[in-house]
Amino acid sequence: MPDQDTIIALATASGSGAIAVIRISGADAIDKVTPHFRAASARELTACESHTVHLGWLDKGERLLDEVLVTLFRAPRSYTGENVVEISCHGSQYIQQEILQFFLGQGCRMARAGEFTLRAFLHGKMDLSQAEAVADLIASENEASHLLALSLIHISEPTR
């Protein structure tokens, strides 16, 4: 069975850009983010449905970190099969690191390379060939390799 801890990692390429996405996965992912997210709608994440996006502010105690979009995926209907929160923030390296370091301090740990996909495999969200195809898709450098990897992922429909 997958580790019981909560993992975090940058889901977008490292470096500066317009936005960055930080992914958090684990049974308590939603609970770790909720106290630090001020939704524009004033709803707490714990009361929100799966597969929803919420505009708001991420804070670090009394200090605001960034205006963000938080996307919520509840287990088992997520990529990993666990509760997943994706934080879309402004893409400066400073903001990315501030958010990562903050949640590491809240008990998350940095995900190892491929660990989100490993958890998906261990939760029966995909088979081994599909998990390997995800790595191939990420590494694809041309249309042919992209299409081949994509076809391998969808040979059998995943259980989402």
Predicted regions: what they are:
Residues 1-147, 151-152:
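A glycine-rich (often HGG/GG-containing) alpha/beta subdomain
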